[in-house]
A protein has these predicted regions:
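Extracytoplasmic thiol/disulfide redox context detector
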Residues: 2-89, 168-169, 205-210
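Sec-exported extracytoplasmic/periplasmic mature domains
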Residues: 62, 68, 72-79, 101-105, ...
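Structural microenvironment flanking redox-active thiols in thiol-disulfide oxidoreductases
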Residues: 74-103, 107-138
Length: 210
């Protein structure tokens, strides 16, 4: 009897990941449907996953190692996009995000480091100025004065407005938030649960494309 129970326990342990993935998604619990669905960018046959985040968000900093590893393993038909959370006013961190994307390789080198500087080492305050951020990014090979100028460039204004509009459209409740194809805003009860739900919604959208 004990041997049989042990066998059942082993089988349950082996099957539990598959069962968790196969668990049917529940609207209102696992995700909500966006009332006016629209992807951030044209899909062109891709499945879009957007993570709305803030460098000043402690939860986003906790989520980043998980979502970064998950993103690295996504198949070619999935397009992952980071999108800074822009609320009412201007946000220097959002401007720094877009300015960093304008310099080849800078975003990849600095993204995780900004999270750590704000949320772990406290080298950057949550309400950092343009000058403070430019000085930080200078550690990664850019001229601080030129980076500050790039952050203030009016050409970034439409990008911030676009991020703000997207947040309104998906009724952003906070950060981090993941949205699939502009249609599904992921809920979940943990960071890993958010990724589980994302995987299933990606599979759902992939099936719909066939």
């Amino acid at each position: 009897m004990i041997k049989r129970l042990a066998t059942f326990a082993l089988l349950a342990a082996l099957l539990s990941p598959a069962l968790a993935f196969a668990q049917a998604l529940t609207p209102g619990v696992d995700y909500v449907e966006v009332s006016e669905p629209q992807p951030l960018d044209p899909l062109n046959g891709k499945i879009e996953v957007v993570e709305v985040f803030g460098y000043w968000c402690h939860y986003c900093a906790e989520f980043q190692p998980l979502v970064g590893a998950w993103k690295a393993k996504l198949p070619a038909d999935v397009r992952f996009t980071y999108l800074p959370a822009v609320y009412g006013g201007d946000d220097p961190y959002a401007r720094a995000f877009y300015a960093a994307q304008g310099v080849k390789g800078l975003f990849a080198r600095s993204h995780d480091a900004v999270f750590r500087a704000v949320n772990t080492s406290r080298d950057l305050p949550r309400n950092a100025s343009v000058e403070e951020l430019a000085g930080f990014y200078a550690q990664y090979g850019v001229d601080a004065a030129k980076f500050a100028q790039a952050m203030r460039d009016p050409k970034l204004d439409p990008k911030l407005a676009r991020a703000r509009d997207f947040a309104v459209k998906v009724e952003l409740p906070g950060t981090p938030t993941m949205i699939v194809n502009g249609k599904y805003r992921i809920l979940g009860n943990s960071y890993k649960d958010m990724l589980r739900i994302a995987d299933q919604l990606i599979a759902k959208e992939r099936k719909a494309l066939r």
